[in-house]
């Protein structure tokens, strides 16, 4: 019988003094401490990694270019990341090389999360009892192994990390109990273990059990008021702003004791603009998007910023087949656009409904060839077309009936409107992924500002999406190279003359 990993869904947020770190001479891979002596003309001191699931592997290529340019690790003093980006932020906060990242981060990142026993049934039982299908112990242990290799302690705290590695690490997490984003950092949670915060930020709802934190005082009194934490990407998927303003500033003038006075007006500081402004020009942020995603930062791509040639892998071939379908749909868009315009012009009574005579007038006014009509409707017979669209059997066609018919012909009008393709969830994990992306995309769109463009490197992962798992080495090398090309293109475009 498979042994169930021990439950890590309940953890203690200790306010006690953490254990002392072992001598640096005893660690396996000594950290590289920043000294500002990197040979580069670029001003960057902060890195911010967006969440993105399987797309995150591209960050290895991005970090590799920063190494070549002399930016990382010697000049980087502050690092932040959300969801999968929090793991890369943790690695970068240690100052380890991109080669070390490539060696230690498993090819199948998803395997770190799926450690529940009992198959699908066991997962559903755990989801019902513990709010997650997998305990997340394997991920928690992996993070601890890395931290122990480089710092000497699997449970190194944010304060100790700053002391040993010389960098501030900030990890956004979602507090479900308070329904807000919190930032784990030396200023806010100095005695929290780094791997606890990283595990929280990677806690995809449903897939992984949430982390429940309570203070020493709560544990002593026995009060059941622990707070639940899940994936930071739910509310803060793009953390480029984290080192803006004063909220996470360690300057004594920005202490909470000073900034939060008077307490009766502290609520006025909740809006992002009140805490995270002005923008910090020393921050370099990274975003990720697949080829089918319409990301706001796609329009920020610099010349030469494009993915490499696709490898001949199963994931790439599957995506190519989907592209063919989308191309056929795209070929239909222009004649359909003309159809909608002409239907509006022939709507004599302006009631938004289409009568049989109005449809006949539209298709016979010379705007459409017989080929266009067949392409859209599959036939050129007006009566047959009307009956196909007239789902309720009435005298007119409602606009909703027209849209429903067009969708049966392969045109997703909703996708054309919002810019994101439909992605029907195949299981509960896909459902959770769609849910978190729906929220994070909307928030990212509303929070992205013009200040972010000159400090953001958009990375296209082409055929690799957030949930494109079971990748082979050729896929991973493709993403590393894509991250490298996009980062190099950005730096070349912003290089000082």
Language-model segment annotations:
Residues 2-6, 12, 236, 288-290, ...:
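C-terminal helical/tail subdomains of lipid-metabolizing enzymes
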């Amino acid at each position: 019988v498979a042994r169930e990993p021990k439950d890590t869904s309940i953890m203690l947020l200790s306010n006690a003094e953490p254990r002392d770190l072992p001598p640096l001479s005893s660690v396996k891979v000594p950290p590289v401490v920043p000294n500002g002596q990197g040979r580069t003309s670029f001003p960057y001191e902060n890195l911010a990694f967006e969440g993105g699931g399987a797309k995150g592997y591209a960050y290895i290529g991005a970090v590799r270019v920063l190494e070549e340019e002399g930016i990382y690790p010697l000049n980087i003093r502050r690092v932040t990341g959300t969801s999968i980006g929090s793991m890369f932020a943790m690695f970068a906060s240690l100052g380890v090389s991109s080669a070390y990242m490539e060696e230690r981060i498993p090819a199948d990142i998803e395997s770190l999360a799926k450690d529940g026993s009992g198959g699908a049934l066991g997962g559903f039982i755990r989801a019902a009892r513990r709010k997650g299908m997998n305990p997340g112990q394997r991920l928690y242990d992996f993070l601890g192994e890395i931290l122990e290799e480089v710092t000497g302690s699997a449970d190194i705290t944010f304060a100790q990390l700053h002391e040993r590695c010389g960098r501030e690490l900030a990890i956004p997490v979602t507090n479900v109990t308070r329904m807000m984003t919190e930032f784990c950092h030396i200023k806010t949670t100095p005695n929290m273990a780094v791997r606890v915060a990283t595990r929280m930020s990677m806690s995809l709802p449903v897939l992984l059990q949430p982390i429940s934190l309570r203070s020493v005082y709560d544990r002593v009194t026995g009060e059941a008021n622990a707070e639940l934490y899940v994936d930071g990407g739910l509310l803060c998927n793009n953390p480029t702003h984290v080192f803006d303003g004063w909220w996470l500033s360690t300057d004594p003038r920005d202490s909470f004791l000073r900034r939060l006075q008077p307490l009766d007006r502290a609520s006025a500081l909740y809006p992002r603009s009140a805490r995270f402004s002005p923008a910090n020009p020393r921050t370099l942020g990274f975003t990720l998007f697949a080829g089918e995603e319409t990301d706001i930062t796609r329009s920020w791509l610099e010349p030469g910023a494009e993915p490499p040639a696709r490898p001949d892998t199963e994931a790439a071939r599957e995506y190519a087949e989907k592209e063919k379908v989308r191309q056929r749909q795209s070929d239909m868009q222009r004649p359909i656009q003309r159809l909608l315009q002409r239907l509006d012009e022939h709507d004599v009574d302006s009631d938004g409904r289409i009568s049989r005579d109005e449809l006949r007038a539209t298709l016979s006014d010379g705007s459409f060839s017989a080929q266009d009509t067949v392409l859209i409707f599959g036939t050129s017979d007006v009566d047959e077309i009307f009956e196909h669209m007239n789902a309720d059997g009435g005298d007119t066609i409602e606009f909703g009936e027209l849209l429903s018919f067009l969708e049966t012909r392969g045109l997703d009008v909703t996708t054309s409107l919002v810019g994101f393709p439909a992605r029907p969830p195949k299981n509960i994990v896909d459902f959770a992924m769609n849910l978190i992306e729906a929220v994070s995309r909307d928030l990212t769109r509303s929070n992205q500002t013009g200040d972010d463009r000159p400090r953001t490197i958009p990375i296209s992962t082409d055929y690799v999406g957030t949930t494109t798992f079971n990748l082979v080495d050729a896929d991973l090398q493709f993403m590393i190279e894509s991250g490298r090309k996009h980062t190099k293109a950005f730096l070349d475009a912003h290089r000082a003359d």
